[in-house]
UniProtKB/Swiss-Prot annotation:
Reactions listed under catalytic activity: L-glutamyl-tRNA(Gln) + L-glutamine + ATP + H2O = L-glutaminyl-tRNA(Gln) + L-glutamate + ADP + phosphate + H(+)
EC number: 6.3.5.7
The species this protein was found in: Ligilactobacillus salivarius (strain UCC118) (Lactobacillus salivarius)
Assembly description: Heterotrimer of A, B and C subunits.
Keyword set includes Electron transport: no
Protein name per the record: Glutamyl-tRNA(Gln) amidotransferase subunit A
Length: 487
């Protein structure tokens, strides 16, 4: 199956019309993964036997005509727990962890008939922007295998971009869906905080984490978000709002839509080619009937320090549970209880995770709480207010997703501050709990450029409508990478 030339709807039609069976489709998917992933290394574990068993059962009962996702495979980021299937968060700490329950999003995907293909590589505990922090392997960018795929959902993006699956799930705490989507030339959506249940997502920063879909097209993305959204009694932060059909009205266009472009998102560090691509996108939206104005989000410049204080503080609390006693990695030949704690955590966690735990613990300490964590929380409120003020007059915000295109493997891994600045344009969206989308908007030296659309809370439908209009007016999403070739 050539996933570059198909979408969810076309494959569903083929399955309903019995051009091929679900089992044949699933076998073809695994055959392709085994060929392509030798170079990309997006998957940490495949679930072939159970996937084929489920495919056969769907063939026996017949593919549901009213469920577009029925019988189609999906890849899952390895911090989303999957019953009886190893879930590691790409950490030595959880190397052999087999959950006894499913994340809520997994139950929802199963209800929709989707087939879990396998678990995807990521930065350890979702801490990173390049997928180089994985304890197990480094995933490559299909457009240039010497480049990173972004992170932390690098495996999720690379698997879709390289045609191994049509859709995947990732998580986004500070840009971890949108930045890899931009680096790989695909569509990635971070939903509104509370739109999708976090139950079963291995926690990084609980006030920021959100699960979302990565796909090749905007409409496919909306279809997957339809399936995973909704209130969940297991997650007290999940919204009880009714979930609309995100595909409804997606083709209505942007005529009359008011779009804001923040001047702060084109500052120092934004590549010239990236800025030009986004400004070209502005012209496209204007030609489609939208009104586009420059505005200011003055407190966004504080986003990176605010984020790394809050996220690291929450991480230091969430990761206390990995102590060498309850579950997870336990150091060998320990001498006493203190040795169990110290050595298990020292040996089980990677450098970046330990760095953030230390930063968070410091920020929460008695002598630093007021100066750091409390102050960061106050500035976070100002960032939220900036967005609220803009949305009084505008329907959508348009900006670059990442300041640059994908950089080389090994180029920034030893410079944490430079690495952290990769998220400067995506972090404010998480701090404000807003929905954000990255979609393809051009190329620079053969590498994809991402356009970011940011909507008001629970206005994903507006974001999808604008994204679809742009996608249909351009050909960037149709570009197919040449694996191992010249792009």
């Amino acid at each position: 199956m050539d996933y570059f030339k198909n979408d969810l709807a076309s494959i569903h039609d083929d399955l309903v019309n019995k051009k091929y069976s679900v089992e044949e489709l699933t076998k073809s998917t695994f055959d392709n993964i085994k060929k392509v992933d030798k170079e990309i290394e997006a998957f940490l574990k495949l679930d072939e036997e159970r996937a084929l068993e489920k495919a056969r059962k769907i063939d026996e009962r017949g593919v549901k005509a009213d469920s577009i996702l029925d019988g189609i495979g999906i890849g899952i980021k390895d911090n989303i727990v999957t019953k009886d299937l190893t879930t590691t968060a790409a950490s030595k700490m959880l190397e052999n962890f087999e959950p006894i329950y499913n994340a809520t999003v997994m139950d929802k995907l199963n209800d929709a008939g989707m087939i879990t293909v396998g678990k995807l590589n990521m930065d350890e505990f979702a801490m990173g922007s390049s997928t180089e922090n994985s304890a197990f392997k480094i995933t490559k960018n299909v457009w240039d295998t010497t480049k990173v795929p972004g992170g932390s959902s690098g495996g999720s993006a690379a698997a879709v971009a390289s045609g191994q699956v049509l859709a995947s799930l990732g998580s986004d705490t500070g840009g971890s869906i949108r930045q890899p989507a931009a680096f790989n030339g695909i569509v990635g959506v971070k939903p509104t905080y509370g739109r999708v249940s976090r139950y079963g997502l291995i926690a990084f920063a609980s006030s920021l984490d959100q699960i979302g879909p990565l796909t090749r097209t905007v409409k496919d993305n909306a279809l997957v978000l339809n399936a995973i959204s909704g209130h969940d009694a297991h997650d007290f932060t999940s919204s009880s709002r009714e979930v609309p059909d995100f595909t409804k009205g997606i083709e209505d266009g942007v005529k009359g839509m008011r779009i804001a472009v923040p001047k702060e998102y084109f500052g120092e560090g934004v590549d010239e080619d990236v800025a030009k691509a986004v400004k070209d996108a502005v012209k496209t939206f204007e030609s489609l009937g939208a009104t586009v104005d420059e505005i200011s989000l003055p407190h966004s410049k504080y986003g990176v320090p605010v984020y790394y204080i809050i996220a690291s503080s929450e991480a230091s609390s969430n990761l206390q549970r990995y102590d060498g006693i309850r579950y997870g990695f336990r150091a060998k030949d320990v001498k006493n209880l203190e040795d169990v704690y110290v050595r298990s955590r020292s040996e089980g966690f990677g450098d970046e995770v330990k760095r953030r735990i230390m930063l968070g613990t410091f920020s929460l300490s008695a002598g630093s709480y007021d100066a750091f964590f409390k102050k960061a929380a106050q500035v976070r409120t100002l960032i939220c207010q900036d967005f609220e003020n803009v949305y009084k007059d505008y329907d959508l915000i348009l900006a670059p997703t990442s300041p640059t295109t994908a950089y080389g493997i090994g180029e920034e891994i030893n410079d944490p501050v430079t690495m952290y600045m990769n998220d400067i344009l995506t972090i404010p969206v998480n701090l404000a709990g807003l929905p954000g989308m990255s979609l393809p908007a051009g190329f620079s030296n053969g590498l994809p450029i991402g356009l970011q659309l940011i909507a008001p809370r629970f206005a994903e439908s507006t974001m999808y409508r604008a994204g679809y209009a742009f996608e249909q007016s351009t050909d960037f999403h149709k570009a197919i990478p040449t694996l191992g070739g010249q792009n």
